[in-house]
Amino acid sequence: TWDELAGIDLVEASTAHSYYWMVKNFYVDVTKIEDRNTRKALGRVFLLYAIEKIIDYSTSFFETNSITAKTFIGLRKLRETLYSEIRPDALCLVEAFGYTDHTLMSAIGSSDGKPYENLLDWARNSNDVNKPEVRA
């Protein structure tokens, strides 16, 4: 049937449309940010997100001749650069949302300043394999 033949294409088209919408609106919102440092930090995150989506769905971009191999290679290099540029701001960006470490299931941003000690405690207490066996 038509649904069976077009089903995969429809899913891919709707996924592409959703990502387009998110990238477009992310860009619009980032450009409205007045604080220069915040706009710069979130601009990098925006660019990384857009590049990740292009890389993730590169087959579609190549099939439609929307991207060249040279551009694709450049995007992969830019992605690596963005990782390095975003890294210093990563903790601040996560903390800005105000999620607790418990919600994030992470001790890296521990408000008590002991992320490594907390990670070790979580590892010890989160799995029965890490608990000593008690024999009666």
Where do the protein language model's features map onto the residues?
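Flavin-dependent oxidoreductase catalytic core characteristic
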Residues: 1-136
